[in-house]
């Protein structure tokens, strides 16, 4: 029994700790650390945190951020932002009886070639007609698509996670019907530029 326990401890001691670093768009702050026998074992791992953990602003605790470890620089694990999602509890808190919810899910391409699936959400103050929902959904799509085409992926990411794009949608759609809230409920990166993928493959070979 003790021999087995000793073996487990010995294996744990053989592991090395690596620091997980956020992308430049999030200030390259620490996302924590992870152990591994070899740095190549960490590549591809998914990391979850909240915007609150990065900014210290408790009002952003419901914004969940997802990153993927794509390469390393010595003991530092470099990540890429791969999406975000608002917490279910927060979304439930927005729902009201006798109001309408307008969702729109579609793919956009940023100025620098990232393909991102975006889920927009608008909540009206009262129940609205189907024609009004259609008009609201059209504006959601147009606003997000235009913003994505004009911005790099990093800039688009900031517009999304810090709520600025949602505010723009709110201002544009409130002209159709009284609104309570607009949000970018979820994003997911579907494709990165081909040249970036090749750079990642090259840099992840070295363990420093």
UniProtKB/Swiss-Prot annotation:
Q: Which InterPro entries match?
A: Ribosomal_eS1, Ribosomal_eS1_arc
Gene Ontology biological process terms in this record? translation
Coiled coil spans: none
Keyword Ion transport included in the entry's annotation: no
Q: Name one GO molecular function term.
A: structural constituent of ribosome
**This protein's GO CC annotations:** ribonucleoprotein complex; ribosome
Disulfide connectivity for this sequence is none
UniProt lists the family membership as follows:
Belongs to the eukaryotic ribosomal protein eS1 family.
* Name this polypeptide is given: Small ribosomal subunit protein eS1
User: Origin organism of this chain?
Assistant: Saccharolobus islandicus (strain L.S.2.15 / Lassen #1)
